[in-house]
Amino acid sequence: MLHKLLVMAALMASPAAATGLKIEVEGEANGVIEIDLAEDVAPGHVEQITALAEEGAYDGVVFHRVIEGFMAQTGDVQFGKMGGDMRRAGTGKSERPNLSAEFSDVSFERGVVGMARSADPDSANSQFFIMFAPAPHLDGQYTVVGRVTSGMDVVDAIKRGDGRSGAVTGQPDMMKSVTVTD
């Protein structure tokens, strides 16, 4: 219990030296989302995300799967670029290796950012999702990489997908630019 409280406190704190992401969103949602990354909880995943952001790999990537009351997923740097074949969005990854799971005691609550993966727990790569609401069934099953500290109003405005799959049709919202912050 104490460990869980310490991890949650670390995620909620905003120390000046913490690594984060600044995501400029464009589409139905317009604005900036700021995320504090949890280097102490998932160091390997945070390293990969920040490297991809620094390379510009996330720039122009759409929110391809957005489920009302659950989460908004993005980060397919292979097939999820605006202007690409959106039927393939969500099936790609980066050229970097997949990551071993870094599960923790951190709960998937509103604003928590987690890594997307296939059925294999060690298959996370570049895709991530932001929670609209708590999802305790994900706890201990997916890697938590951070928490939104500013811009949940922007997250809430992201264009929703259709039905249970959450596949976004038409013109999806996108991450116009993603930069690493200190």
Go through the PLM ranges and name each one.
Residues 2-8, 15-182:
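Cyclophilin-like peptidyl-prolyl cis-trans isomerases
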